[in-house]
């Protein structure tokens, strides 16, 4: 209830981690060397462009935002400054959502206290899910998201 406006259903909101949920870091020796050079030179757009997208989670993200109208936020624990590059990467995939950078998963856990209780966050590993609690769901790179 907000401002005496009673709704039949609570707005659903989702969040997901960029790394491990929406994309995989560069693999292979040559790609890793190029990625390391891009990081050293702070060329974040080039670095994020080297990441391999996970098709099913990206389709789930696009569907959630564009068809269902569900608000989604993307979180990253990569180095500061990559938010704009991730935002552009997502825009090229067909979705515009807010991207937030955190130093580590513990900061995300602290931030979750201020979000809606119905919010779900999709993470890459079981350890991250255990840390974030009941709101977290481990997302497979080969399957759709489940609310």
Stretches with model-predicted labels:
Residues 68, 79-147:
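C-terminal cap/substrate-recognition subdomain and adjoining C-terminal extension
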């Amino acid at each position: 209830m907000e401002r005496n406006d009673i709704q039949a259903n609570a707005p659903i909101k989702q969040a997901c981690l960029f790394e491990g949920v929406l994309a995989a870091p560069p693999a292979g020796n040559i790609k890793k060397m190029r990625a390391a050079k891009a990081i050293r030179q702070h060329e974040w757009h080039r670095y994020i462009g080297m990441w391999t997208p996970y098709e099913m989670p990206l389709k789930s993200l696009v569907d959630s935002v564009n068809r269902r109208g569900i608000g989604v936020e993307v979180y990253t624990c990569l180095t500061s400054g990559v938010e704009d590059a991730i935002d552009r990467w997502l825009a090229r995939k067909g979705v515009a959502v807010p991207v937030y950078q955190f130093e580590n998963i513990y900061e995300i856990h602290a931030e979750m206290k201020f979000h809606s209780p119905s919010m779900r966050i999709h993470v890459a590993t079981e350890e991250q899910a255990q840390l974030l609690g009941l709101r977290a769901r481990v997302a497979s790179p080969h399957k759709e998201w489940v609310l």
